Amino acid sequence: MAETLISPGVLARENDISFIAPAPTEAGAALLGPTVKGPVEEPTVVTSYGQYQRQFGTTFESGSNKFEFITSIAAKSYFEQGGNSILVTRVVSGSFTGATNTALTASAVASQPFALETISKGALLNNATGSNPDTAVHNSDGSINLGTADNLRWEISNVNDAQGTFSLSIRRGDDNTKSKIILESFNDLSLDPNSENYIERVVGNQTKTKSSDGEVTYISTVGEYVNRSRYVRVSSVNNPTLNYVGNDGITVGSNGVTSFSGSLPIAQSGSFQGAAGNLYNGIVPNNHFGSISNTNTQGLTAANYTDAISILENKDEYVFNIISAPGLIYYFGNHKVQLDSIISLAETRGDAIAVVDIEQYGATVSNVTAAASTVNSSYTATYWPWLQTQSATGKNEWIPASTVIPGVYAFTDGAAAPWFAPAGLTRGGIPNVIQAERKLTRAQRDTLYNSNVNPIATFPGAGISVFGQKTLQKKKSALDRVNVRRLLINLKKFVGDVSRNLVFEQNTTVTRDTFLAQVNPFLDSVVQRQGLYAYRVVMDDSNNTADVIDRNQLIGQIFIQPAKTVEYIVLDFTVEPSGATFGA
């Protein structure tokens, strides 16, 4: 019970407004595009390039050719530049499903005791011969013909009939019994739903489905148990075995038998099969890199990106500060709808900047400036020209600038802060590229920059660097610069997080002081870190009148003066005559 004063005395009370605010969430880049494998149209956080390779693959073969998707190059560039995480949304054409395990043999039941399904989707997961994509061929040592690093196999071991337990291993598809490559293992699994080691509980049984309510496309989760496996889920348990103990306290099983051997799997290994979904879905030729066209971007059409873009609208579920879909080119009419959707997505969310490519490979400066003039958004930036890099296939390929620019942003965030310009020789360098499509002259850079296109310049001895930081906003204001837009994104994210914690609190001075006690120190730190010249925060009776309070509102006004960058340096050299004196 709170202390009260009935008779004269002193009541000491305390009011703690020294809350320690969390640092702004450090979200990474959202990448949309085709991948070799992985979940389809399911935004997935990846925290290293090695993890990306395991989940989404790197290269694949089609006929006698070997390919790499631009998405893979973008992911590698981002992590090499110091990025912490990316949100990958795989785009496909056609229907893709997971592969299921080949028949698991049980000791004494007609059906297999349980079934597994790969989390990754597509026919690539079928570990089989080319003549029959749904039937794997096993060799005498237990290996599988034509297995690859991109598909899987399963193995049952350590079967204990007395205890009703067994082990499950997921192995890489190109290994063999003499040299196993075990990706993950689960031990002491049980088919008893009441057991802590019940296979669905330990491995997981969830699957994701794409749904729509007519306005928004979203991902629904089906299944009770979170997937702890990175590669498979339990799609069904056909013969659950309850751990009954007989009346004598010794015998086990509902029928009084002394073991679980009737429904347990025997020690064995096998492959996965039955997955649907081809990387190209019949689009031939599959145009990659510099050959991307209006109707063919890496074996897809631009329309294939529609649902993936829509899914990312939910800013409460998916957090990122950059979005890029390398392979979509604004110049192409069929791509324009999807890129407009990405730009609109960034504007609506208000917490990310879209990096888009304006022109196809081989365009001229006038082509680029003409295309850029059709876009007007402070949440969008474009860069030119294209760049040449070495693909994982060993070939030199041409890639659009949006492939590597998120990496430049990541480097800037790590080396300085989001409100520093991701440009120049200090922070704008682009590593691991061979050459730019064009070595721009000073006049060409001026023409591009006047049209809000950020030039990628080549300087002798200094390499290839981003040499501009404009957004595609046509109106001249502070927000026509990338560093200011990213500053605002960062500030709004922090202040928004603080404000969210105050919703449903009492509309009193205590709540206002709580807000100010967190926001003012943060803005002070931004001033000290060269992001702002000055700021002022107003949240008091002047803007929270009785009428505002009666409407259940709390109003805060934040006035800022963003720090500007040095983009033009003027140096005056004056030649003095002999005998001239210089003042102190």
At which residue positions do the language-model features occur?
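Structured, hydrophobic secondary-structure cores that serve as assembly/anchoring elements
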Residues: 1-124, 159-167, 171-177, 194-197, ...
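Conserved aromatic
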Residues: 46, 183-186
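Polybasic, low-complexity Lys/Arg-rich tracts in intrinsically disordered regions
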Residues: 106-118, 122-149
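Intrinsically disordered, low-complexity regulatory segments in eukaryotic proteins
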Residues: 138-161, 309-314
